[in-house]
Amino acid sequence: MEKSSIEIFDENYKIIKENIACAAKKSGRKFEDITLLAATKTVDISVINHAISSGISYIGENRVQEFLSKEDGFLPVHKHFIGHLQTNKVKDIIDRVELIHSVDSYRLAQEISRQALKRGITANILLEINVGEEQSKSGFCYDEAIQMTREIAKLDGIKIKGLMAIPPICENSEQNRPYFAKMKKLFIDIDTEKIDNSSMDILSMGMSDDYAVAIEEGANMVRLGTALFGRRKYNI
């Protein structure tokens, strides 16, 4: 008999918590030092709310329209935006999420600043770094990250809270270890610069296939979808 989505979540959540605790210990930290963000793209609202009731405190959506269609149904939870964000969609979510993970250009940062100022709020953002230097991916070049942090930090209505990265797709999660280590070094380097309006609080890296390695290398936030909820059903 096929397991329900809730049964799949319950089984996976237990295993993931154990894996996070183990990886955190290897990096000299505790389970509580790691934020588990549930990536809820295509996940039914009833399953999301079960996850929240089970202890998930942070959720991340990838698509603006899907987020807006589900937002009113969420139980109390920290809501983040983790997908590619078009400048013309910024106005739709700017005051609805606590953190935007995917700021991948100065132009996008400018629009977030503009919309935040219109609403009299401060938007918390992460800078997305193209750590694998892949032409197919967006994000700031690794070598320009410190300078771009300085430039974006000058924009009003924005607070830089850290970095996000998606390394290249690999057959083995160990192949991504050097990329995660590189991101941790950049995270420390930017923090050392003590740039005004920038605090390196969050290093968001690691997804379903490589989150344990990411934590071992210094991630303090991981974004898990398939590992928590099972294979996605693309019906939205």
What are these language model-derived features?
Residues 1-186, 190-209, 215-217, 229:
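Conserved alpha/beta-domain cores
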Residues 219-236:
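Gly/Pro- and small hydrophobic-enriched strand-loop and loop-to-helix capping segments
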